[in-house]
């Protein structure tokens, strides 16, 4: 370390898109990168997901000295950088999908739940992008960081904090250099199961020299007062959402009720199973994910074409035919064969895939239920802070510099406590 050393922050991706933030903090010969996701743009209809294609379409950042040279063809400058590390905030693909592209010698940190769940989610090789020289279902080593325990990366220290998002085990990050502190929220909200965790992170981050905050909640100003706004309709918090699913069951005692949720929203699923008046039955693939990651057993069923999982308890299997014939005993997760559901039934789509109107697959997916005279109810609870919550988080941290990312409209987030910068891709800020 010399007197001339400065903390720099370089913004490589995810600045005016929903997802895909890639940001480097550097000091002297040490640097860290977060996150490692891919921007979701299904409308591009890309020919492949090669490194070159992703770079060309700006779906990942063109970050030097972090990607695997086997993929980029460019060596890592180990003379310039003596200490390197990377971090992912949570399970969602716009923050994790390209982690296998990281050079294998660079340590990758995540919260303990994220580190444990990612290999399980990628068991079939269809979650993460593949690593060079490995089978497609390989997941590179991820170090499960202890919450709030400092991680030394040369002159830089990382501290990982539990947070709240609709991905199980989401975290926020504090990056400390010899002269500055940078806080990164990852994806964050105050209306989930753990607002107390978010407030503890806000307290730890208070007065940071820079706050890098997601801004999904200000991405649709034209829908600000629209009751049909896709991101912020329905229940105002996760507890209300669970209660509404219970109410729908109680209001429809003699009706087939099915549902689906997003695989990484494990906590919502656990709450539904815990509170449901009906017996909840999961598709075997989801039951296997829960067993593999949490070592907990739940009732499940197989579709006729499904492979069998040796870790599932045979005594908990429910036959698919029994579920199709049922209209009062079960609340079950349906993932296909929607035309086999009972006419007049009810299907609850709770932030499951396809995720919404921005996905070309969503409209035909919804329309098939009407065609089969099945009521379709979308029950969403956003994983992201809305405009009011974003102001509260910024107000709790009171940063010197605010950098909104992960939003279509970063200019709509303001910093009453200091400066706000709106960096371009590849731009470096010196603190």
Segments (PLM) and residue ranges:
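C-terminal regulatory/interaction regions
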Residues: 1-2, 12, 16-17, 274-278, ...
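His/Asp/Glu-rich metal-coordinating catalytic cores
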Residues: 2-17, 21-85, 94, 98-264, ...
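Short connector loops at secondary-structure junctions
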Residues: 37-39, 214-223, 285-296, 380-389
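Short, charged, surface-exposed secondary-structure boundary motifs
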Residues: 43-45, 118-123, 170, 193-195, ...
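Short internal beta-strands
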Residues: 106-116, 212, 279-289, 348-351, ...
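Short, charged/polar "capping" segments at the starts of alpha-helices
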Residues: 116-119, 221, 287-292, 355-358, ...
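Hard-cation-handling environments
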Residues: 226-335, 339-341, 405
């Amino acid at each position: 370390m010399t007197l001339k050393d400065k903390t720099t922050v370089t913004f490589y991706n995810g600045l005016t898109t929903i997802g895909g933030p890639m940001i480097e903090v550097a000091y002297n010969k040490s640097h860290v990168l977060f996150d490692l996701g891919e921007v979701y743009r299904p409308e591009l209809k890309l020919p492949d997901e090669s490194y070159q294609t992703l770079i060309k379409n700006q779906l990942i950042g063109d970050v030097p000295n972090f990607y695997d040279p086997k993929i980029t063809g460019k060596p890592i400058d180990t003379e310039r950088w003596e200490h390197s590390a990377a971090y992912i905030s949570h399970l969602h693909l716009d923050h994790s999908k390209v982690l296998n592209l990281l050079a294998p010698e660079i340590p990758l940190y995540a919260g303990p739940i994220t580190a444990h769940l990612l290999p399980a989610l990628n068991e079939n090789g269809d979650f993460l992008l593949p690593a060079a020289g490995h089978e497609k279902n390989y997941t590179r080593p991820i170090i499960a960081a202890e919450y709030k325990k400092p991680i030394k990366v040369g002159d830089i220290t990382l501290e990982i904090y539990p947070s709240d998002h609709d991905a199980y085990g989401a975290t926020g990050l504090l990056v400390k250099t010899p002269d500055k502190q940078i806080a990164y929220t990852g994806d964050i909200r105050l209306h989930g199961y753990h607002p107390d965790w978010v407030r503890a992170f806000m307290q730890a981050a208070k007065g940071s020299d820079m706050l890098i905050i997601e801004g999904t909640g200000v991405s649709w100003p034209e829908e600000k007062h629209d009751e049909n706004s896709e991101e912020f309709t329905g229940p105002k918090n996760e507890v209300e959402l669970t209660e509404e699913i219970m109410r729908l069951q109680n209001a429809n005692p003699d009706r087939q009720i099915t549902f689906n949720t997003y695989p990484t929203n494990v906590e919502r699923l656990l709450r539904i199973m815990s509170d449901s008046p009906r017996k909840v039955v999961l598709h075997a693939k989801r039951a296997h994910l829960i067993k593999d990651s949490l070592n907990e057993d739940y009732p499940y069923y197989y579709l006729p074409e499904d492979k069998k999982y040796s870790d599932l308890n045979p005594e908990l299997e429910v036959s698919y035919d029994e579920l199709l014939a049922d209209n009062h005993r079960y609340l079950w997760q349906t993932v296909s064969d929607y035309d086999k559901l009972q006419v007049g039934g009810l299907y609850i789509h709770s932030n499951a895939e396809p995720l919404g109107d921005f996905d070309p697959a969503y409209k035909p997916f919804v329309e098939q239920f009407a065609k089969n005279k099945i009521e379709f109810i979308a029950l969403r609870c956003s994983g992201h802070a809305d405009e009011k919550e974003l102001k509260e988080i910024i107000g709790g941290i009171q940063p010197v510099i605010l950098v909104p990312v992960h939003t279509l409209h970063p200019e709509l987030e303001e910093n009453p406590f200091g400066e706000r910068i709106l960096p371009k891709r590849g731009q470096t800020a010196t603190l």
